[in-house]
C-alpha cells in the first residue's frame, strides 16, 4: 500500500514537472529563435569563444575565458 502511494506521488510529480516545463518553452518558431538569441548573447558576454550555452567549462578555461 505504501509502495503504491509512493509511485502515485512520483508519477504526479513527474507529470506536473513536465507540464510546467512545456509551458515555459515558446512553441512558435520566432519565439524559439528569440530564446536561442538570448542564450547566445548571454553566453558570448561570459565567454566569446563559446558559441553554444552548453559548451564544457574546460573549453572556456582553455580559451582564457571564465566558465559561464
UniProtKB/Swiss-Prot annotation:
It comes from the Eukaryota. Residues 1-24 form the signal peptide. Residues 25-45 form a propeptide. The keyword Secreted applies. One of its GO terms (cellular component) is extracellular region. Expressed by the venom duct. The keyword Disulfide bond applies. It is found in: Secreted. Keywords: Disulfide bond, Secreted, Signal. Disulfide bonds join 47-55, 50-60, 54-65. Belongs to the conotoxin U superfamily. The cysteine framework is VI/VII (C-C-CC-C-C). Displays a mini-granulin fold, a structure composed of two short, stacked beta-hairpins connected by two parallel disulfide bonds. This newly described fold is derived from the same cysteine connectivity as knottins (ICK fold). The name 'mini-granulin fold' comes from the structural homology with the N-terminal region of the human granulin. This is Conotoxin Vc7.3. The lineage of its organism: Eukaryota, Metazoa, Spiralia, Lophotrochozoa, Mollusca.
Amino acid at each position: 500500500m505504501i509502495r503504491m502511494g509512493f509511485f502515485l506521488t512520483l508519477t504526479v510529480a513527474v507529470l506536473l514537472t513536465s507540464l510546467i516545463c512545456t509551458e515555459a518553452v515558446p512553441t512558435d518558431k520566432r519565439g524559439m529563435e528569440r530564446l536561442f538569441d538570448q542564450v547566445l548573447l548571454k553566453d558570448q558576454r561570459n565567454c566569446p569563444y563559446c558559441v553554444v550555452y552548453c559548451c564544457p567549462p574546460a573549453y572556456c578555461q582553455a580559451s582564457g575565458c571564465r566558465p559561464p
